[in-house]
Amino acid sequence: MPKMNVESFNLDHTIVVAPFVRLAGKMEGANGDVIHKYDIRFKQPNKEHMDMPGLHSLEHLMAENIRNHSDKVVDISPMGCQTGFYVSFINHDDYEDVLNIIEATIKDVLNATEVPACNEVQCGWAASHSLEGAKEIAQTFLDKKAEWHDIYGEAQ
């Protein structure tokens, strides 16, 4: 296959083993700032996916809470394939710390009593949320924390 412009289109989705967290890209700005983009893969590509209400609530919860653990977060957003998220950090390339930040954020999800910004004023599809769905996704991901380093299932 020809090399594509989008990094994830060059990833062989048939050989990765979810869950995992991998560095998906690095970009340096004109002034020396560096953005590191991580692929947080919750579900096995082409085998399973997150249901939209749970994914949507997980997005709100992670977007709000991850910033309590790092001031280096640029963005966190869901993948259209519904198997994971991308999180980008500026001037922060410590993979182990990124894992710690993700873990703390997932624990925040599990302790949440409501979904932030779950209303028509602050959300574009406020009817599509599930706190319980988000917690189920988060718990399954956290239960497999030992696998987050292992992108290709080599340790199994």
UniProtKB/Swiss-Prot annotation:
The keyword Cytoplasm does not apply. It is an enzyme of class 4 (lyase). Homodimer. It comes from Staphylococcus saprophyticus subsp. saprophyticus (strain ATCC 15305 / DSM 20229 / NCIMB 8711 / NCTC 7292 / S-41). Its EC number is 4.4.1.21. Involved in the synthesis of autoinducer 2 (AI-2) which is secreted by bacteria and is used to communicate both the cell density and the metabolic potential of the environment. The regulation of gene expression in response to changes in cell density is called quorum sensing. Catalyzes the transformation of S-ribosylhomocysteine (RHC) to homocysteine (HC) and 4,5-dihydroxy-2,3-pentadione (DPD). Signal peptide: none annotated. Its cofactor is Fe cation. PANTHER family: S-RIBOSYLHOMOCYSTEINE LYASE (PTHR35799:SF1). NCBIfam families: PRK02260.1-4. Belongs to the LuxS family. The gene is luxS. Fe cation binds at H56, H60, C123. Binds 1 Fe cation per subunit. GO terms for molecular function: iron ion binding; S-ribosylhomocysteine lyase activity. This is S-ribosylhomocysteine lyase. The lineage of its organism: Bacteria, Bacillati, Bacillota, Bacilli, Bacillales. It holds the Pfam family LuxS. It catalyses: S-(5-deoxy-D-ribos-5-yl)-L-homocysteine = (S)-4,5-dihydroxypentane-2,3-dione + L-homocysteine. Keywords: Autoinducer synthesis, Iron, Lyase, Metal-binding, Quorum sensing. GO terms for biological process: quorum sensing.
